[in-house]
A protein has these predicted regions:
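Short alpha-helix plus adjacent loop in nuclease-associated cores
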Residues: 1-24, 28-29, 74-80, 178-191, ...
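Glycine-rich, often acidic, oxyanion-interacting loops/wings at catalytic, nucleic-acid
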Residues: 36-131, 216-222, 230-232
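Basic, amphipathic alpha-helical segments enriched in Lys/Arg and hydrophobic/aromatic residues
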Residues: 231-233, 237-283
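Short helix-capping/linker segments at secondary-structure and domain boundaries
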Residues: 16-19, 48-49, 110, 151-155, ...
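Conserved, surface-exposed functional patches that form binding/active-site neighborhoods
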Residues: 5-14, 44-58, 206-210, 214
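Short, solvent-exposed helix-loop connector elements
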Residues: 21-37, 65, 88, 178-184, ...
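Phosphate-backbone recognition surface of nucleic-acid-processing proteins
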Residues: 1, 128, 133-140, 145-245, ...
Length: 283
């Protein structure tokens, strides 16, 4: 079987039927490791918070009115106002609280490391990260994750290829003339798919440029800013249209996220090509 497979691969390679797989370079791989470490830390932080909150709930300790969970005021309340009769429960509370604080410190430390890593990236990667932040719903961490998971966006000839890479396209079950489309395939990059779906929730709001988004867009060219504004209008209309047709919010946001990938591709390719032309013009 191995010999037959090898011969088949050799024939496919000779005929040009094989598609090369992108292998991340050292810079992309290092950034990907750091970004995924931060994601793991956030998930551990969520688990630690759940343990503490469920422990307090199980013993009837309710958060005071006007106090939001996991703020400094909330943690001060846990440390000073929550007490138990038995020493074993006091130790349990102390341990859960320590884990929550440790997880928060870990996330903050990794986010500082990501900031430092961005400053050390090649100019082209930094430019794409800045440009992607012109899109509503995509701040620095989301842009860095996209860059780390995808690499150069210009390696995709068409935005549909990027959509398929993320696994955000519809699955298909076809037999003869009968075509059946189902839920998204989820066969692509789960990290990329998660980021764009989270970002897509921002487009349920009417198009607008707030203070935070305006600050991010200062680092982008007018062409990139125009594409980001076009994305706001188009994706909000898409969201409103699908909701109006009775689609559930999760399905709608997934569809908007898939279309958002098209704008991510357009902006990334625009910046990469623009930077690749400049050195030749200077020469």
């Amino acid at each position: 079987t191995d010999r037959r497979d090898a011969a088949k691969l050799a024939r496919s390679y000779r005929s040009g039927d094989l598609t090369a797989v992108w292998v991340p370079d050292a810079a992309h791989e290092a950034l990907r490791d750091l970004v995924r470490a931060r994601l793991a830390a956030k998930r551990d932080q969520l688990r630690a918070r759940h343990r503490l909150s469920k422990f307090l709930l199980r013993h009837g300790r309710r958060t005071p009115e006007g106090t939001n969970a996991w703020t400094e005021k909330y943690l001060h309340w846990v440390k000073t106002a929550v007490h138990f009769e038995h020493t074993a429960q006091e130790v349990t509370l102390s341990d859960y609280l320590h884990e929550v604080e440790h997880a928060a410190e870990r996330v903050a430390r990794l986010e500082r490391s990501i900031d430092a890593a961005i400053d050390a990236l090649p100019a082209k990667m930094r430019a794409v990260i800045d440009a992607l932040q012109s899109l509503r719903g995509i701040a620095q961490l989301s842009a860095v994750t996209i860059m780390a998971e995808v690499g150069e966006l210009s390696r995709f000839e068409h935005p549909r290829q990027l959509m398929a890479y993320s696994g955000a396209v519809s699955s298909e079950h076809t037999s003869g003339e009968r075509v059946r489309r189902g839920a998204i395939s989820k066969t692509g990059n789960a990290h990329l798919r998660r980021i764009v779906v989270e970002a897509a929730w921002a487009y349920r709001h009417r198009p607008a440029v707030g203070k935070t988004l305006a600050l991010r867009q200062r680092r982008s060219s007018p062409a990139v800013t125009a594409m980001a504004w076009k994305a706001q209008n188009r994706l909000h209309q898409r969201y409103a249209r699908l909701i109006g047709r009775g689609k559930c919010k999760q399905q709608t946001v997934t569809a908007v996220g898939r279309e958002l990938l098209g704008f991510i591709w357009a902006i990334g390719v625009h910046v990469e090509r623009e930077l690749s032309v400049r050195p030749r013009q200077a020469a």
